[in-house]
Amino acid sequence: MVLTLCFHSDRDHHFLSTLPLAEIRRLAPGGFSVFVPEDLLPHLSPSPSCPTPPLPRELTWSAACNPTNFPHLFRHHRPPPPCTRLTPRPPPPTPAPPSASTLPRVFHGGAPPAAFQPAIDFLHNTIQKDTIASSIIAALNPSLTSSLTLYPYALPPRWPSALNQAGIPATSYGHQSHPHPIHKTIETHLLHEHWANRATLPSTVMFMKRSKFDKLRVSNAALVKSASNFLHLLNPILTARDADRYTHLPLPDTLPSTPLYFMHHSLMYFSPSQIAGLFLAAPFLERLYASLVLPAESTIGSHPFFPSLYRYRTTGEHLHYVLEGNPSSSYTQPLTATQWLTTSSITAGDLHLTVTVLESWFSVHSILITRGVRPLELPRDIISLPSPDAVLLPNPSAFDIPLRSRLVPRDVCESLFVYVRAVRTLRTTDPAGFIRTQSNKAEFDWVTAEAWDHLAQFALLTAPVRPNTYFLPLLSPLAVVRHWLFRKQRPIFATLTLLSASTAAAIPIAIARLRTHSVTQLTILGHHFTPPKILARLPVALKRLIPKRLLPHLPSHLRPPPSWSPVFTLTFSELPKARFLTFPISGQTHTLLRQLHVPAILFAPQRPSRPLIFAGLLIGTVPVLYGAYRWFVSRFDPQTVYNRYSDLLHRPTWHLTFEREPLSCFPTPFLPHPSSHPRRARRLPPLPPAPPLPPQPPPPPPPQPSPHPPLFPASIPSPPPRPSSPPPPATSPASTPALTPIPAPKTAPPLTFPSPTLVAEPDAPVTARPSPLPLAPSRPFSELYPGHYADHSGSFFLQQPLVASSVPYPALDCLLVSCSAASGIPKEDLWATLCHIFPPSDLVSDLGLSTNHLTALAFTYQWLVTLRSGELVQRHGLLSAPFAFEITHTPPVPPATVGHFALSAPLTPTSACLTGGAPSPVISGPKASASLPRARFGPRPEAPRPPLTPPGFTPITEPTPATSPFALAALRFRLNRQPLPIRQVHAYSIALPRAKNLVSNLKNGFDGLVSSLPASDRTNLLPLIQALDHTADFPPARPPVGLIHIAGFAGCGKSYPIQQLLATQTFRHFRVVTPTTELRHEWKRALKLEGPSSWRVSTWETALAKRASVLVIDEVYKLPRGYLDLALLADPTVEFVIILGDPLQGSYNPTNPDSSNHRLIPEEDHLRPFIDFYCLWTRRLPRLVADFFGVPTTNPTRGHLAFASLNTTQSPLLVPSDSMARALTAGGHRAITYAASQGSTYPAPVHIFLDRNSNLVTNHVALVALTRSRSGVHFRPRAQDLPRHPQHLFTAFYKYAIDLLAHEADPSKPRPTPVDVTLLFQQQLRGLTILRDPSFSRITGGATHAFLAHAPLFTNLHGLRPTTFPDNLPTAPTYLARSLPYHQTESYPTSALPHRVFPASTTDWSAADDHPRVNPTFVAETRLPLQSELAPTLPSQPEPSPTYHSPATFETVYPGVDGEALARTFLAATDPLELEIFFRNNWSNQFPFINRPDTVACNPLTLVAPTHNQKQDPTLLHASLAKRLRFRDSTAPYTITAKDQALGYILYHSLQRAYCRSPEPVPFDPVLFASCIAENDFAQLTSKTQATIQANAFRSDPDWRHTFVRIFSKTQHKVNENSLFTSWKACQTLALMHDYLILVLGPVKKYQRILDSRDRPAHLYIHAGQTPHQLSEWCQNHLTPSVHLANDYTAFDQSQHGEAVVLEAWKMRRASIPEPFITLHVHVKTNIECQFGPLTCMRITGEPGTYDDNTDYNLAILYTQYLLHRTPVLVSGDDSLVDRVPPMNPSWPALAPLFALKPKPETSPFGLFCGYFVGPAGAVRAPRALFAKLAIALEDGSLPEKIASYVAEFSVGQSLGDSLWSLIPPELVIYQSACFDLICRHASPQLKLALRLGEVPDWGSLLSQLKLRFLTRPLFALLDAHTRVMVRTHKAHLLPSGHALHPSTEPFY
């Protein structure tokens, strides 16, 4: 053994590391001291050779004693002591046993989280910590990844730790939502970790969904490292809900013969007798694993132990179980299921079963039922189940309380025990008050209210009870004896009482006998003593004393005997544990005394007289009675008293236990019989053989079963529903149960599955069921594959598989044969297509394929299929399909159940639901296909091939390359009967200068990405490039290679025929080079390259290190110049080259200015001699885009142009620059540049992002961006962002679409002229042969074809509408007409636009004259037009405010604080001059103190916070400019950069994500906008007096430029929580803007605020327009008792740059604000100036919508920085609060440097928002700031005028009652009490009434006046002062009618 330690010996200091113990003892012969864990003590025991003293259990070490080898690994959280010499300690005389505090800490459930934390903290160096942390992360990463994969569900906050304690490794990082995530997590653990490990033998699963069963098989196969042991799935369909849950398949007569069964969440529905019937029905069954969902505490009460997990209630004999508060997930089960927890074994005749509870997870229990009884099995035992940490309070003395009402938390009970004894003066309400602070905690939600009440009463009544413990020194032996006698006084007194009683009873009798007898011998303890002679003569003396005359008269028995023989003896008899002195006697007394073990007396034969006996007993009862009195009156002995005290007050921990006993029953049938004639399993065609099972021990031979009941009885109790999806509890006759066997998959991956068989017929094959595949959510087929489907044939739902299915070809293939015969496509290819579209469950059916499969084939291959079945005619496929044919369906004839599809077959009538699958007759021969039309789409087989050379055509070839096998195969290749668009195979030789130029630039890092890669990634490429550079200097000789160049327009189909060519045998050794990773993925997907073959497709730099005989270069013009030559130089094995590209789409341009690659001839010029034809057609582009370029297209889609703000498609966002692409990608959007998208194809509309860089894009790159989509183009954000040059393709395409739209609306207008690409790109097309028809032939020899006529355009307007957006969006995107310039809208009628900009208003303005207008004669001239043209709108109907009921809260209890005394000491003695600054030779004056009242404290209390007043402080504004304003460098307008647009776009989407709404625009509401204008005019004009407006007439001065603002400072005293006791602060600047902007943009902001208020979700709180009471109510409903996050910012207003302007423009466009308003807003923000200079586009306080824009910007930043989801958030301007600390957005680290705004997150359990501390209890005004205001007002004498406002603020928290203390930090409690004290001192009685809880007393006069039945005090506080006085004095009847309903206009916050 090796130990790491540091010790001191007799010699020098030794610092040892990993020394053997023998070496340690040798170096320290004098002994040493070391602390070690307990498990190491046996190895360090003292020995004779090394007298080591006993070792403590902790290591003493020092951080100063370096170097050390982590000796702190043996300690537990103790600070290191100073380095001192340790001396050997002598061994103690008697080593004391280790106490609990010194023992090593024991951790359960894994290593302790902080066991090595001191070791990590000891590492001061960051590198050392990173080294340690890397190993920790490496160890944690697999476990965390596995846990997130297995348990991806988002769990409530405190449940991950609870599940971890239960052994379930769930984490708090789950992200998937679930109706009951905790139950789902437990179920997942049960299936994949608990059951999957126990299925070691062939097993059958019962009552489980098919998807869960498939996943369970995969988990078991991975664990057992072989084929899965789960072979059968048995799902009886017993209710209608089961039919929806389980697959409906027949069930055999007998159960599967597997030794293991697993019953999933159903045991509670079966009785032990039914389980016995199951074992009898399955004689091979040995073990049954069953899961039981049952709250064990249901046996003791109706309140659950885990209410957040489940709730239940009992009704009769049933238990209703609700999962996690979700009523939809509830179900009912029998209450008798608890017998499974109380049964240890089941006996049913000769059958013996053992029941074992394996594990319990809260309400889920794993039960094992085994056949037989084991030898060591206990018939009766006790089990413990999960329960809270609780104690059971005793019953009261007078009555009994239910057990559930006496269970309380142990921690609370113990804390309350200490609390009631620690309080000096305990009040009656103190225990209840303490409990109130604990009862609202989430961890105690299982405690009933009755239990809390019982605990409070118990603590109050037992508080005076104290233990009778005392401690005596016992300094003398006498004290020890007295103490012993005191402790044993009760048993000693009892013994003496009995002895005295027996002695007193025996004395009279003894005296009577001594008269006639003498004592001759005394025997004591076996020793004989001779008594003195006087005792022997005593009877004689007595006889002499008796007169002789009396002797005759004495009774005979009293007369002395004739002889004096001694008969009396005294003896001791020895008993088992005591010795007793006995006096033998006779008679009844002898029997009685013997039973009492008291001394007995032996007498002579003569009986004593009865009076003497009675006298003796009477004397003996005296001490007995006295002893009994003392026994019952005196206290118990101290030990008994303490034991009773401990039992009463120190209760042990309560555990939920069950006593289990055996159970005897009669077996009953397990399942009901489905019908009188059960269906047997039908034989199907055999499956391919599956891999054999691994060797396993054979199951025990089945016992000979005795006669048992049938498997299917006539009735059964309620079927077993699932807790995850519970069915209704009612029982019903069952449908046919389903046994779903699972075969082996088609392929053989490492985990293979055996092919199961049916038990009833072992040799019969079963229906093939493929292995489970990951599926997408179920959606309509028409949404997954959009198109115009005939007869709604695409409306069925489909779960699209994420990977292709591997289902074998079906036997019932008549539909495939019919479609193959019609189209000429092989039926195997058709089946492969269906495997890519449908999941395996939809491909396997006993009835064959259906019309759903026909629709999928028709969509894929562009068919319109007419299906005839009797009189029914249906069409399947697309209405626009170019090909059509007919199929007939023959319905089944009973008893057959399968129909038949065929071409031109006879018809019979049937229903609309058609299925068919009869084996089709083989259609072969020329007649079968010659008469059928053939489609031109889809893959075609290679054989039979056409002739090598068409007649009349001889290719021009070079001698060697052109006659190679590759050249011949390329010329021979046909796709859809069409050859490749080439004339010949060219010979190409390497151009060494081009290769040398490129390799030199690569080596120097001027081109490519190799130089920017990490060193570890470029180790393989750099040596290769250096070698190529050397090879280019001395090139080896090599012959020319064959080369073909396929060039054509975008989307003409250059790649697809080459991909089919590479699939042939000749071209199997190939590699493909792509310019981008995007194209690489498309090629891999098209070629189906996976695993080892994926190397064949790579990007251009990594391809230089690979070898293949065929080289394919895609998009060659996007690669550096000379790449073809360098590739041939790098790979001498290349024999044939295929290059693809379009010279029109631009060429490569180096980004490094030092690169010399641009000096070479461009590739389009270098490769032009090798272009045989240029294919000027397209298969990709929609007709709108193709017609614009004048290019024919085969795409029937019309296409559209739109301006949209949301990318709802899978296509990426195309941006002009790399920087914007990186910014948007970091924000979570898929973005690539225009040029990088070259070669890609997107089925959805492509989104082209426009900014100022779009003007710099050439037409070559613009062509790339416009030609990517199959369906249309979306520009974003608006048409004004299009390039200004009219010849730019973006602008030209927009103008073409506009003109086309106008022409279709009005045919009299000219049709727009398309762009002629042959003229636009004539430089690139010069000398090329252009083909305009894809159906060309080489017979023409490549002659130039004439231009084809343009295809006719559709005339409907729906062509401009996108068809790929889902229907669940609120509105469609902004289309073309939404962004038309206003000067152009005159020439195009509104009816021609797809959407109206202003919908037709339904308001009747004809009656506008009936409404009074405002007299505008006093309005300034600049305001007259807008004021006079708009008529006022009708007032909206006011919504009644919700009724507010006072909560039943406890009155607030305040500690006694003198507010005035606290005010005297509130301000520390500080020199005010130290708080000022010196600016421009002047001192500031924010803390004036001269001539200020100081009646309260030594200094004026106004010094607690800065005072901003420009009149008293001339330096205020100028000194604040540097912090409050940001200036532009010049007078030029601020330019919106690409970064601003990208960040604004990200912020906009984050804001919409916060509102949980679509970013798409909503229709404009002109009526609402008009009302906003009227409201704004009322606020700016009507509500003001004429004098005020005339005084401010300069604000409407026409000479005042509208972009100029006047900056002034805000006068205020900054008394708030963050400004108290601070020094000089910059003032807040306000901007005075032109009235034009206020009147024009003010209605826009009001309109946006109304729209936002409608969409705002409940978890989002905006403080605008809300009262503090509403804030408090929202907090009570949404906040949780957790740590809150406050995101503070540095210079919030000044840090908002261009991205804020872009965000505001996006918001206005979403609201469909007319474009002039948006343009005006952007113009003002980018051109703003003030008297100090030009300003940046920062936020200026005073501009319209300052608060709303600040709030939205803050909210957008929060949702960009964090993953908030539905977390409650409070936002108000730059103030924000998040309910709990959310996870960081993974993209934020990349986005944070791009923002000028710097967040400063702060976490605290006490959240401060807008001056209020908020929490789950509500909101309370920050007490310190409120106290400062009260104290300042008290000092300057203004308190009477302000106290009403302060009382209103204080009443918000006061209304919460005693719960407000949970919201205030402990250090501020004194200020809250001081505020209460000052208000009580100085407020009027009517104001104090607002501080009372509950309703105002029922004053009849007030209530009759207000027509209310009650009036809450918060509402009373809002009344004006006059009304409050009248109400208070009972004079409300004097108020005018309705006066009291108007709240006070005094500010209250």
Swiss-Prot record:
Every (+)RNA virus helicase C-terminal domain range: 1176-1308
A Pfam family the protein falls into: Peptidase_C21
Entry keyword annotation includes Cell cycle: no
Organism lineage: Viruses, Riboviria, Orthornavirae, Kitrinoviricota, Alsuviricetes
Domain (+)RNA virus helicase ATP-binding, first and last residues per copy: 1017-1175
Name the UniProt record assigns to this protein: Non-structural replication polyprotein
Positions of the catalytic residues: 814 (for protease activity), 900 (for protease activity)
RdRp catalytic domain span: 1682-1788
